[in-house]
A protein has these predicted regions:
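Amide-donor transfer/coupling interface in amidating biosynthetic enzymes
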Residues: 5-135
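Phosphate-binding active sites in nucleotide-utilizing proteins
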Residues: 1
Length: 135
């Protein structure tokens, strides 16, 4: 929706649901990340993700075959999307919308690093932001 309505990419689509997408903003990864774990670097000091994790890097787990198409990065950044998290090889792993209380997207799945006694901080932050929004 961001690509279509803010970036004006009327044909923006996800290759998982449309393998012939004209504007594949989410495209098939060259290597599947299903079951993978990697260190994700958080670059944007002051971003929500940086505040939530209070770290320059985190250990992240995945269950995906598709990811952000890097060829759209410049356009998204020009439209106030902050690319906040990257893999060690520079692939985008997380983003957030500037000036929004909690518009965050990640390629990794915070639920996969959560345990009964330790819920991933990004999930807790989302719950807290939701509660604040209801007030």
């Amino acid at each position: 929706e961001f690509a279509r309505n803010v970036c004006d990419l009327k044909s923006a689509d996800h290759q998982e649901t449309n393998q012939f997408a004209e504007e594949p903003v989410i495209s098939k990864l060259s290597c599947s990340l299903v079951g993978e774990t990697e260190i994700v670097n958080i670059h944007s000091v002051g971003s929500i993700m940086h505040k939530v994790y209070a770290a320059k890097s985190i250990l992240a787990k995945y269950h995906c075959n598709y990811g952000f198409n890097q060829s759209y990065a410049k356009l998204f950044v020009e439209n106030d999307l902050i690319l906040t998290a990257y893999s060690s090889d520079g692939a985008v792993r997380g983003f957030e919308l500037k000036e929004h209380p909690f518009f965050i997207g990640t390629l990794f799945q915070p639920a996969l690093t959560s345990e009964r006694d330790h819920i991933d901080p990004l999930i807790l932050s989302f719950v807290n932001a939701s509660e604040q929004h209801q007030k």
